[in-house]
């Protein structure tokens, strides 16, 4: 799993804001103007339409979601909500492969429009809470995207703006579940980032301290008790459980997300991965094959990153459980192909696939070929990766075997 360096400072706010918006849809008068006295969650028509559209989006039915969002834009052309939803739609197109900049411009343009109309709403309304929701959300998404592109100064600036408007939302006490959600994300990641990336400590001086353990507990409360933010809390807990090596919890969540959004490739690959990590081999095998089939059929969002996960799972299972080395080699080579296509030569799946091919070659007595694979691992793998030392030891072991073979002749 790719660990985005600035990811949380932005995403903390991002998810608080996005789900808060859906929870706090406003009542409009017959003239289409916002009535600041009616900050409601009781507008069932808007709530239902937005909820259906968001579910389409999470299930990667982007055209269906966009139709609903554009209807909101037609009905409320000067309100930030439709522009934010359209930007959110573009963001989820980015999620399966965050290295792909194809949708960046559209996503940023919609977030800029959100900020424009939210600032006008903020200036024109006595009640600042709604506008602050959208300002916090839009800035958070911009910060998150800038962090993916390693534009750290822009990411920090956007994150700080998002924090500023998040604080303005706290005046509305009925938002406590959403605030706890945002606080939980913030507490976890603000402590996690400097431990994983010490070079970012100077940037994090701009932000309040966090508490990782409290953050997890807050998110679990939201995931179990909240209504509007429940799914988003589970989405982030899925990643957190993985980072904290809580594999059974990660598996249960991943399965739940995939069951609810079966065409979402991000949730699908997490489900396959966590089934694999938890020893559910048949389940992992079935889902990995399904992912590769969907890639072959060009289903929306299914591409090389998900393929990397799936092909590696199938390679490992065939090598270590079925002892079918020919099939294992095919899938390892497929994993390598996906890694190269997605500029991920230093990914764990690519490195481990080279190691797998080396071990198979060694088992089959192809010692020169085995050394070649191990050398690739030693050259490519980061110093912190255990495969690097493993490959170096394997090279020495194979060299000894070659010497023994020569002596025996």
Language-model region placement:
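Residue at a conserved register position within TPR or TPR-like alpha-solenoid repeats
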Residues: 56, 90, 139, 146, ...
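Amphipathic alpha-helical segments of tetratricopeptide repeats
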Residues: 74, 115-116, 163-167, 217, ...
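Residue-level detector of the short coil/turn that links helix A to helix B
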Residues: 60, 143, 150, 210, ...
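Short coil turns that delineate tetratricopeptide repeat
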Residues: 77, 126, 173-175, 227-228, ...
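Alpha-helical linker/edge segments of TPR/alpha-solenoid repeat scaffolds
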Residues: 92-103, 190-198, 246-249, 280-286, ...
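Bacterial Sec-dependent N-terminal signal peptides
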Residues: 1-33, 37-40
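Short coil/linker segments at helix-helix boundaries
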Residues: 31-37, 42-48, 56-67, 78, ...
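TPR alpha-solenoid repeat register
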Residues: 82, 131, 179, 233, ...
């Amino acid at each position: 799993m790719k660990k985005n360096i600035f990811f949380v400072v932005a995403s903390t706010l991002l998810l608080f804001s996005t789900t808060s918006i859906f929870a706090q849809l406003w009542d409009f008068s017959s003239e289409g103007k916002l009535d600041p006295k009616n900050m409601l969650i009781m507008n069932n028509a808007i709530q239902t339409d937005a909820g259906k559209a968001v579910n389409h989006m999470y299930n990667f039915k982007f055209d269906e979601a966009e139709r609903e969002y554009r209807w909101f834009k037609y009905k409320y052309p000067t309100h930030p909500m439709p522009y934010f939803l359209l930007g959110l739609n573009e963001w989820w197109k980015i999620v399966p492969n965050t290295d792909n900049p194809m949708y960046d411009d559209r996503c940023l343009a919609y977030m800029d429009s959100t900020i424009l109309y939210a600032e006008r709403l903020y200036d024109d309304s006595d009640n600042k809470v709604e506008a602050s929701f959208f300002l916090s959300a839009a800035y958070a998404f911009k910060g998150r995207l800038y962090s993916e592109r390693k534009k750290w100064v822009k990411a920090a600036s956007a994150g700080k703006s998002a924090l500023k408007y998040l604080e303005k939302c706290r005046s509305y006490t009925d938002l406590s579940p959403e605030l706890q959600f945002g606080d939980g994300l913030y507490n976890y990641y603000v402590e996690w980032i400097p431990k994983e990336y010490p070079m970012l400590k100077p940037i994090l001086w701009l932000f309040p301290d966090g508490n990782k353990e409290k953050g997890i507990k807050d998110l679990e409360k939201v995931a179990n008790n909240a209504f509007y933010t429940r799914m988003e809390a589970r989405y982030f807990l899925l990643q957190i459980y993985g980072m904290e090596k809580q594999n059974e919890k990660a598996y249960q969540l991943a399965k739940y997300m995939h069951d609810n959004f079966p065409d979402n490739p991000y949730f699908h690959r997490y489900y396959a991965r966590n089934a694999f990590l938890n020893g559910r081999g048949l389940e992992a095998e079935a889902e990995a094959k399904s992912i590769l089939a969907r890639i072959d059929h060009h289903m929306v969002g299914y591409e090389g990153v998900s393929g990397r996960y799936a092909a590696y799972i199938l390679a490992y299972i065939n090598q270590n459980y079925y002892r079918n080395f020919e099939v294992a080699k095919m899938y390892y080579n497929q994993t390598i192909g996906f890694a190269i296509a997605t500029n991920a030569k230093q990914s764990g799946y690519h490195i481990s696939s080279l190691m797998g091919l080396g071990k198979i070659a060694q088992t089959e007595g192809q010692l020169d070929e085995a050394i070649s694979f191990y050398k690739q691992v030693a050259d490519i793998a980061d110093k912190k990766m255990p495969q690097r030392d493993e490959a170096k030891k394997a090279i020495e072991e194979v060299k000894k075997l070659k010497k023994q073979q020569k002596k025996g002749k």
